[in-house]
């Protein structure tokens, strides 16, 4: 499986592993961050999260158009930089008012950066196998590539949880899912007597000395800061991804070409007939239908 693969495959796979690790680290704590920091309800959080994911999966369409014009490598590099800025905005502790502006700005940047990165890196992987000596290894190459992606996605939630719990523990607190919502209800003056009694018992379990209002404010602030550190992990992951991409660029530079650029001399271009093109489009539409509805 691994024998005879071009070196560029491993460079691109590792770069993508770093990017996916950062992305899924962010996803693992993002909805919790929204509820803890801003007091959003589950419905409001779901709406924001859904719109963000819709943008993440739609913007690659435009990323592909830009790559056809400017080149895949440039778009991948720009995508990493834009995503890094987005994660950095999430990692900066802020007040509620400026925090919301920065949060929505960060989501826009992450979605745009992912749109430039996602897909274009895969195209370069495919281009590595246009050369006749590697064409038979294309299927196993993408198995390796997506294996690397899944490794990054598998460890990301654990990393996010560990960092968050560690930083919260340094403040002498532990994570309890009910506290952020109850704390916001208390501070907003909307808490019921039963919920306030629950909150007071949770405060006692945290061994917090102080009035309940101070506990609510402190817990929200410290938990939000802990999530900021979690987003910082995503920033570090992207830096590693960029370093791998730049350091080993020579191993896949020859695969950074599109239809408007000169192809390497050893690349054999496959010409599709109109009937073959039609069949592939129909197959894609059927796949879309299955993915969307099932």
Question: Where in this protein do the model-derived segments appear?
Answer:
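Short amphipathic helix-loop junctions that connect adjacent transmembrane helices
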Residues: 26-44, 165
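C-terminal ends and interior cores of transmembrane alpha-helices
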Residues: 78-100
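Hydrophobic core of transmembrane alpha-helices in multi-pass small-molecule transporters
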Residues: 17, 86, 98-120, 288
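Cytoplasmic membrane-interface "Motif A"-like loop-to-helix N-cap segments
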Residues: 68-81, 136
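Central cavity-lining transmembrane alpha-helices of secondary-active solute carriers
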Residues: 50-68, 154-156
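Intracellular loop-helix junctions on the cytosolic face of multi-pass helical membrane proteins
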Residues: 1-7, 131-135, 139, 161-294
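Cytosolic juxtamembrane N-terminal segment immediately preceding the first transmembrane helix
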Residues: 1-16, 20
């Amino acid at each position: 499986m691994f024998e005879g693969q071009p070196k560029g495959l491993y460079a691109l796979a590792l770069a993508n592993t770093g990017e996916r690790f950062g992305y899924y680290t962010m996803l693992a704590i993002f909805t919790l961050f929204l509820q803890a920091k801003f007091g959003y309800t589950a419905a409001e959080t779901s709406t924001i999260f859904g719109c963000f994911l819709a943008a993440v999966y739609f913007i690659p369409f435009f990323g592909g158009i830009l790559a056809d014009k400017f080149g895949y490598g440039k778009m991948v590099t720009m995508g990493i930089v834009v995503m890094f800025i987005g994660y950095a905005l999430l990692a900066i502790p802020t007040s509620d008012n400026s925090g919301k502006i920065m949060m929505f700005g960060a989501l826009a940047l992450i979605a745009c950066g992912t749109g430039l990165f996602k897909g274009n890196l895969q195209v370069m992987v495919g281009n590595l196998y246009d050369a006749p000596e590697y064409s038979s290894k294309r299927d196993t190459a993408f198995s390796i590539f997506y294996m690397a992606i899944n490794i990054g996605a598998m460890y990301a939630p654990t990393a996010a949880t560990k960092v968050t719990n560690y930083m919260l523990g340094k403040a002498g607190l532990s994570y309890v899912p009910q506290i952020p919502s109850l704390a916001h209800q208390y501070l907003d003056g909307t808490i019921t007597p039963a919920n306030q009694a629950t909150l007071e018992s949770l405060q006692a379990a945290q061994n917090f000395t102080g009035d309940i209002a101070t506990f609510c404010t402190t817990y929200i602030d410290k938990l939000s800061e802990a999530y900021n550190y979690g987003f910082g992990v995503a920033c570090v992951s992207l830096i590693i991804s960029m370093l791998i991409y730049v350091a080993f660029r020579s191993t896949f530079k020859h695969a950074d070409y599109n239809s408007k650029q000169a192809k390497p001399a050893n690349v054999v271009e496959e010409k599709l007939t109109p009937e073959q093109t039609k069949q592939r489009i129909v197959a894609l539409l059927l796949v879309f239908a299955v993915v969307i509805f099932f």
